[in-house]
Amino acid sequence: MSQNEPNPLVIFSTLAAIILAAVAVYVVKLNKKNGPVLKPDVFQKFPLIEKTRLSHNTCIYRFGLPKSTDRLGLPIGQHISIGATINGKEVVRSYTPISRDDELGYFDLLIKTYEQGNISRHVDSKSVGDHIEVRGPKGFFTYTPNMVEHLGMIAGGTGIAPMYQVLTAILTNPDDKTKISLVYANVTEEDILLRAELDLFAKEHPDRFKVHYVLNNAPENWNGSVGFVTPEIMEKHLPNKDQDGYLLLCGPPPMISAMKKNAVTLGYPKARPVSKLGDKVFVF
């Protein structure tokens, strides 16, 4: 080989080093991009990028993260706080995203707009491109895979949000064997939120997830229960107090008060005013 000819081994080694360096830089950047965006003590602005109306007063709002590869950074079972200045007063309310934390670039909120709901009306007034201010995570419940054998859930209305967050994380994780039983109460059949998603989960995981619907005003030929969630309904469709699991509750205050009393009737310990991780009866 002539002294002026390039050495193939040197060329190959140089190219390999360049490729490895590029891969290393990409991995570092990717890891940085996938870091959590949320900050517990600082409100940050996130733009509304999509609004899907489910009913006359309920929407799924999708908010964008700074980068398409960012994740929100919300542990399963935790929620976020939305803050706003309304009529000169600082108002803060908590909401649970229904999107998974491994869904990158955005997060989804299921919100029902109430006439007297300051934050819900504030969010509903937003157009695509407008921002809301969010901080988090917060909350006393953090789910980890296989932490219990069986979870019982009772949800009312938009109280389905934290339940959906938890059950989605469980049922999309092939290594998590936790069973889930959900009793979901609403006024009318049209009020049942995320029904298609819940029914699909029940169909795909018949041995691990069961959902029972309860309506105040039921149509003819209704297959679920009618009226309020009673101790009898709970006893039939939820795990009993002696099983390895928790009873999770989320819904309107009057409903939650009644569910706490029903739980005591069935032998569950009395729920604390502020629930903590490990409580047999946990209220979101």
From Swiss-Prot:
Pathway stated in the Swiss-Prot or TrEMBL entry: Protein modification; peptidyl-diphthamide biosynthesis
Secretion signal span: none
Topology relative to the membrane: Single-pass membrane protein
Primary location: mitochondrion
Cell compartment(s), UniProt: Mitochondrion outer membrane
Gene3D superfamilies (alphabetical): Nucleotide-binding domain of ferredoxin-NADP reductase (FNR) module, Translation factors
Reaction catalyzed: 2 Fe(III)-[cytochrome b5] + NADH = 2 Fe(II)-[cytochrome b5] + NAD(+) + H(+); 2 Fe(3+)-[Dph3] + NADH = 2 Fe(2+)-[Dph3] + NAD(+) + H(+)
Residues passing through the membrane, by range: 8-28
Binding site for FAD: 124-139, 150-182
InterPro entries given in the database record: CBR-like, Cbr1-like_FAD-bd_dom, FAD-bd_FR_type, Flavoprot_Pyr_Nucl_cyt_Rdtase, FNR_nucleotide-bd, OxRdtase_FAD/NAD-bd, Riboflavin_synthase-like_b-brl
The entry's keywords: FAD, Flavoprotein, Membrane, Mitochondrion, Mitochondrion outer membrane, NAD, Oxidoreductase, Transferase, Transmembrane, Transmembrane helix
Record GO biological process: protein histidyl modification to diphthamide; tRNA wobble base 5-methoxycarbonylmethyl-2-thiouridinylation
Cofactor(s) in the UniProt record: FAD
Function: NADH-dependent reductase for DPH3 and cytochrome b5. Required for the first step of diphthamide biosynthesis, a post-translational modification of histidine which occurs in elongation factor 2. DPH1 and DPH2 transfer a 3-amino-3-carboxypropyl (ACP) group from S-adenosyl-L-methionine (SAM) to a histidine residue, the reaction is assisted by a reduction system comprising DPH3 and a NADH-dependent reductase, predominantly CBR1. By reducing DPH3, also involved in the formation of the tRNA wobble base modification mcm5s 2U (5-methoxycarbonylmethyl-2-thiouridine), mediated by the elongator complex.
Assigned protein family: Belongs to the flavoprotein pyridine nucleotide cytochrome reductase family.
Description of how the protein assembles with itself and partners: Monomer. Component of the 2-(3-amino-3-carboxypropyl)histidine synthase complex composed of DPH1, DPH2, DPH3 and a NADH-dependent reductase, predominantly CBR1.
PANTHER family: NADH-CYTOCHROME B5 REDUCTASE, NADH-CYTOCHROME B5 REDUCTASE-LIKE
Protein name: NADH-cytochrome b5 reductase 1
